[in-house]
C-alpha cells in the first residue's frame, strides 16, 4: 500500500480519530483527507503543468499537516518554513527553491517574497469551495520525485535545500514503524518544528499507523508550567525529541510515569544521548523503551537505532547509536579514501535508499558531499565514528574537533564526562579563541543540588572529579553557572547564542 493510501485509510476506518492536536485546535483523519484533497485539487487546477516546490509557512498549526499532504497529492514537494526563521533566510529559500507558491496557516510577516501567498483565510475558502473534489492520484509524488525539501545551514552562509524523495521517506517510515515496534492509534509527541527533519520521525510514523500527533510549540517550551500542563493532558505514548529537550524535562521532578502513565517508547535523534540522561529516563519510566538513533537530514532523519537497556548503559559510558537499517549500509572512510577496518575511526558514509538526491540548485555542493558507491547513492556525513561488530559509535562532528595548545580533542567527549560529574545537571563546552587560535575551554554548567556556599568551591569539586577522568589539557580553565542551557527552536543546544553570551 502506498504511503498516502496508508494515511487515508484511517479517514475510512476511523474518520473521527484525532490526527493532530495543537493547543485548542485539532483535526480528525476525515478532515485531514477532505481538506488536503480540496487543496490538492485547487493546486492542480491553478498550476496544471508545474511541479515546482511549494513553501509551507507557519509553526505548529494543524493547517501545516493539511498543506504538506495537499502539496504532495498535487505532485509538488513541500518546503516547511517555520515562523522563527529570519526574513532574510526565508527570502533566500524562496529564491533558491524556485517556489512560486507559499501556503500559510498564519500571518506572513516576511515582505517582498517572489512567490504567490495563500493566506489562512484564502486556505479556508479553498477548503470550502473545493470540498468533495479529489485530486488525480496519478499526479501524487512518487518514486524518486521530491516529497519534501528541508533547508539546513550552509558553511557559506546560504541555506542548503536537502531533497528527500518519496522513496527515501517510504524507506524511513517502514523501518521506523517496524524496528521501533510502533502500534496503531498511539499518541506521538511533536516537539520539533517542521523545518527540522526530526519532526518527520513523528509525523509519518504517526499518520500511517492512525496515531495522534500532540504538538507543543516554542512558547510552551519557554514556559515550563504550560509545557508540563500540556504533557499531563496528552497521554503521550511515543516521545520523539532531541536529548537536550528530554534533559530539560527531567529537571522537573514530576516528569515521570505518574505524569505519562502510558509512555511506551522514547525516540532520540539529532544529538548525542548522554548516558546519564538515558539512565534517569529508565528510572522515571521503567516500562518504556528507549531508542537511540542517528542520521543526518541528508539521509532521511535516521539510519541506525539501538534499544538502550541497563546492560547497554553499564557496558558503554558513551552510548552507541545503533545498528544500520537493513536496506542501507555504513562505511567508515579514512582520510586517504580507503575503508577503515572494524574499530578504527574515520568519517561516517551512509549508502542506500535513505540517502538524499542532493542539494536543490547546488550541483557543486552536491558533488562534494554525495557520490555513488556500487550503484547506490552515498552521503559523506562529516561525522566521525567507528563500527564494531555492526554497531555504530558516533564521535562527534569532524568540525567539532579542535586543537588546543597542540592537543586535538573532541568537545563532546569533554561534555560527556562533565555531565557525569556530581553536582552537574547539564553542561556545554565553549572553546574561546584568542586571535585565530583557541586559547582555553569554558564550561557552561547547570548545577545540580549542592551545599557549597561559594561557586569556586563547587568548581573545585567538579574539577577534582574531572581530573580522574580526563587529562589535564582537557579540563576547562573557566566555569560559568547558569539556570539553563539556551536551545535553538529545533531543540538543540544553541552554541552560537552561548558563545555570544560568554564573549559579550
UniProtKB/Swiss-Prot annotation:
User: Which positions bind ATP?
Assistant: 152-153, 292-297, 383, 394-397, 492
Localization recorded for this chain is:
Cytoplasm
Supply the EC number(s): 6.2.1.54
Q: Give the InterPro entries listed for this entry.
A: AA_adenyl_dom, AMP-bd_C, AMP-bd_C_sf, AMP-binding_CS, AMP-dep_synth/lig_dom, ANL_N_sf, DltA, DltA-like
Catalytic activity reported: holo-[D-alanyl-carrier protein] + D-alanine + ATP = D-alanyl-[D-alanyl-carrier protein] + AMP + diphosphate
Q: Which domain of life is it from?
A: Bacteria
Q: Where does D-alanine bind?
A: 197, 301, 492
Which Pfam families does the record cross-reference, listed alphabetically? AMP-binding, AMP-binding_C
Q: Which GO terms describe its biological process?
A: lipoteichoic acid biosynthetic process
Spell out the molecular function terms from Gene Ontology: ATP binding; D-alanine [D-alanyl carrier protein] ligase activity
Quote a single Gene Ontology cellular component term. cytoplasm
Q: Which cysteines are joined by disulfide bonds?
A: none
Keywords per UniProt:
ATP-binding, Cytoplasm, Ligase, Nucleotide-binding
- Top-level EC class, please? ligase
User: What is this protein's function per UniProt?
Assistant: Catalyzes the first step in the D-alanylation of lipoteichoic acid (LTA), the activation of D-alanine and its transfer onto the D-alanyl carrier protein (Dcp) DltC. In an ATP-dependent two-step reaction, forms a high energy D-alanyl-AMP intermediate, followed by transfer of the D-alanyl residue as a thiol ester to the phosphopantheinyl prosthetic group of the Dcp. D-alanylation of LTA plays an important role in modulating the properties of the cell wall in Gram-positive bacteria, influencing the net charge of the cell wall.
**Would you identify the family this protein belongs to, as annotated?**
Belongs to the ATP-dependent AMP-binding enzyme family. DltA subfamily.
State the name under which the record lists this protein.
D-alanine--D-alanyl carrier protein ligase
Q: Which species is this UniProt entry from?
A: Bacillus cereus (strain AH187)
| Gene transcribed to yield this protein | dltA
